[in-house]
């Protein structure tokens, strides 16, 4: 591949879709068809490098690959970006699309248009991309090709004939798709003579080479040896290597307008190559950064503690190393009276939280326990400044003037027959309906504004069970709203157990308190004395369960005789148990914490 490629011969496109609609399989066939990967070296989900991606069959990190394709007797360079499909990684999708001029919207012929399809479509439209509608999995017996084609054409307001049919499994229609991309997608724009500007759309950590930064050149040329500058932080580095992924790394002398490739500077911290930032050079410095950069904000917070208290420093080291490859993790040290030393971590969503816990276990051999997920509340105590509270333990005591909770705009796509049960679920979760839109004769999109706290527990599971698995949903931050929230504490023998505290809506305080009290009463071993488990809001107890005492039969040795002898023994036992209740402590086994907290994730 020559170093200099004319912008007119470059086509940059992304593949976007809902989870499990065949993005990575289509990418595999494109790699084979263009000759980038030989049949011998080919494997499923070739671009998904993380073992979790391969096991779960999902894409977590965006991947860009440079391919060559001949069309109309001219050789073109195709830069293909395979993006994540899960709602947690929407920011990553939006920055990846900023590196493209066209987007292939992929819809599973067996599933039809789903919520994340619409969300990604809106992202593509915001980035002014040419939309190429494609129906995948058309070879499956269960595929409703005609119905899905009609639905996709209605959503995009295009002709039915414009929707392409492909099969990533068999390769049907893939050649025609690549030809269409070359003919319809616009070439990249940019000025080769102006100050260099490169958009960072992804960065990964390589244990041998340090941070590998994936970029799209928007203006100018950047060469090996140039001193580059990050426009958001002003940090400067010398460029050690420039190249493209083909799909394996292939070093080059330079990258110019329209090209997509990677930079290596030897930096070991991925936070210094922030996704969405603009790179320029020290000698010919650009003054205006590329638009759209923002730091992805964590939406869900949870405490992570090592099961073995001696592994606190190992957990810190594990999180530090994960942060190298995933800049969106946020964590600060915290202490729990029940669980010991750990970290309060911020995540993009529940899937992100699950993946981080799994990577800590698999990559660093750390067994951890996570507290129930919570969100960030804005709490204003009477006569004091507003506090941002992410941990129920930090909930202020005393009179509170106002509490605000974060809200999200939720889009739910479902077959029409389940609309009633979905509306019932959303209303139970304090959702406010914003609108409903029908697609064809079988599907509808429901728009709700809901508190984020109501969807981080089990909303997805409840939605799937009420719709037999057919509904899908997507959400975006919407702002915040005042709410009637309270802190529910769980007391064992009158002592608070901070690991079980939660901030909940006042209407759900009783149900939360009674359910967790009941669960604890079933899990905590019986003691020599009676143990009360109470759920309390401040000093007011809202729910209670009692673990009955283990009772020794002290009169077993009395085979007859005077009844007063038995009464004396029973009275002595009663006094001993009363004394034990005063001074006794309830030891809660680690397994009880694990079982109780895991049931509330």
From Swiss-Prot:
All residue ranges annotated as the tr-type G domain in the record: 8-189
The EC number(s) this enzyme carries: 3.6.5.n1
The UniProt keyword set, sorted, is: Cell membrane, GTP-binding, Hydrolase, Membrane, Nucleotide-binding, Protein biosynthesis
- GO molecular function terms here? GTP binding; GTPase activity; ribosome binding; translation elongation factor activity
Which residues are noted in the entry as GTP-binding?
Answer: 20-25
InterPro entries linked: EF-4 (IPR006297), EFG_III/V (IPR035647), EFG_V-like (IPR000640), EFTu-like_2 (IPR004161), G_TR_CS (IPR031157), LepA_C_sf (IPR038363), LepA_CTD (IPR013842), LepA_IV (IPR035654)
The record gives the membrane topology as: Peripheral membrane protein
Report the catalytic activity: GTP + H2O = GDP + phosphate + H(+)
Metal-binding as UniProt keyword: no
Location (main, coarse): membrane
Give the UniProt subcellular location, in the record's own words: Cell membrane
Instruction: Identify the Pfam families for this entry.
Output: EFG_C, GTP_EFTU, GTP_EFTU_D2, LepA_C
What cellular component terms from Gene Ontology apply here? plasma membrane
Q: Which example biological process does GO assign this protein? A: positive regulation of translation
Q: Does the keyword Protein biosynthesis apply?
A: yes
The record's PANTHER family line, in alphabetical order, gives: TRANSLATION FACTOR GUF1 HOMOLOG, CHLOROPLASTIC (PTHR43512:SF4), TRANSLATION FACTOR GUF1-RELATED (PTHR43512)
The family line of this record is:
Belongs to the TRAFAC class translation factor GTPase superfamily. Classic translation factor GTPase family. LepA subfamily.
Known role: Required for accurate and efficient protein synthesis under certain stress conditions. May act as a fidelity factor of the translation reaction, by catalyzing a one-codon backward translocation of tRNAs on improperly translocated ribosomes. Back-translocation proceeds from a post-translocation (POST) complex to a pre-translocation (PRE) complex, thus giving elongation factor G a second chance to translocate the tRNAs correctly. Binds to ribosomes in a GTP-dependent manner.
Q: What is this protein called?
A: Elongation factor 4
Question: Which organism does this record belong to?
Answer: Tropheryma whipplei (strain TW08/27)
């Amino acid at each position: 591949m020559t170093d200099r490629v004319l912008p007119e011969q470059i086509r940059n496109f992304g593949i976007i879709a809902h989870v499990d609609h065949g993005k990575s399989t289509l990418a595999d066939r494109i790699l084979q068809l263009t000759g980038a990967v030989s049949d011998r070296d080919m494997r499923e989900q070739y671009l998904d490098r993380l073992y979790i991606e391969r096991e779960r069959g999902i894409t977590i990190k965006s991947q860009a690959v440079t391919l060559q394709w001949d069309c109309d007797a001219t050789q073109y360079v195709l830069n293909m970006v395979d993006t994540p499909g899960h709602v947690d990684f929407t920011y990553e999708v939006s920055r990846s699309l900023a590196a493209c001029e066209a987007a292939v919207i992929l819809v599973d012929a067996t599933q039809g248009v789903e919520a994340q399809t619409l969300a990604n479509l809106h992202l593509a439209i915001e980035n002014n991309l040419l939309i190429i509608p494609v129906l995948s999995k058309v070879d499956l017996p269960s595929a409703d090709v005609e119905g899905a084609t009609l639905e996709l054409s209605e959503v995009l307001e295009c002709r039915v004939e414009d929707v392409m049919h492909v099969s990533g499994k068999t390769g049907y229609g893939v050649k025609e798709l690549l030809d269409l991309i070359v003919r319809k997608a616009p070439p990249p724009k940019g000025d080769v003579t102006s100050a260099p500007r490169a958009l960072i759309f992804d960065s990964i950590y390589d244990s041998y080479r340090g941070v590998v930064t994936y970029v799209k050149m928007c203006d100018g040329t950047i060469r090996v040896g140039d001193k580059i500058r990050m426009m958001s932080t002003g940090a400067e580095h010398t460029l050690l290597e420039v190249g493209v992924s083909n799909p394996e790394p292939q070093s080059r002398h330079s990258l110019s307008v329209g090209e997509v490739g990677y930079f290596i500077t030897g930096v070991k911290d991925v936070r210094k190559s922030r996704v969405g930032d603009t790179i320029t050079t020290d000698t010919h410095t650009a003054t205006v950064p590329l638009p759209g950069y923002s730091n992805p904000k964590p939406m869900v917070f949870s405490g992570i503690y090592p099961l073995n208290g001696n592994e606190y420093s190992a957990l810190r080291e594990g999180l530090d190393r994960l942060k190298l490859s995933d800049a969106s993790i946020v964590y600060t040290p915290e202490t729990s009276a029940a669980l010991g030393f750990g970290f309060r971590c911020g995540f993009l969503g529940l899937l992100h939280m699950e993946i981080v816990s799994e990577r800590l276990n698999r990559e660093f051999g750390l067994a951890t326990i996570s507290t129930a997920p919570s969100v960030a509340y804005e709490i204003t105590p009477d006569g004091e400044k507003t506090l941002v509270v992410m941990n129920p333990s930090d909930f202020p005591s005393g009179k509170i003037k106002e509490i605000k909770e974060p809200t999200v705009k939720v889009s739910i796509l479902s077959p029409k027959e389940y609309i009633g049960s979905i509306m019932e679920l959303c209303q139970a979760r304090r959702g406010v309906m914003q609108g409903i839109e029908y697609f064809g004769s079988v599907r509808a999109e429901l728009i709700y504004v809901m508190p984020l706290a109501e969807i981080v527990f089990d909303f997805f599971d409840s939605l799937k069970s009420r719709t037999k698995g057919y509904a899908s949903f997507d959400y975006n931050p919407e702002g915040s709203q005042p709410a009637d929230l309270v802190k529910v504490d769980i007391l064992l023998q009158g002592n608070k157990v901070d690991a079980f505290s939660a901030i909940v809506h006042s209407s759900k305080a009783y149900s939360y308190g009674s359910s967790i009290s009941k669960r604890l009463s079933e899990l905590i071993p019986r003691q020599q004395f009676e143990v009360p488990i109470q759920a309390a809001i401040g000093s007011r107890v809202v729910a209670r369960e009692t673990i009955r005492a283990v009772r020794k039969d002290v009169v077993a040795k009395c085979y007859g005789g005077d009844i007063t002898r038995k009464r004396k023994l029973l009275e002595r036992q009663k006094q001993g148990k009363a004394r034990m209740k005063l001074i006794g402590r309830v030891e809660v086994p680690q397994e009880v914490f694990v079982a109780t907290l895991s049931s509330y994730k």
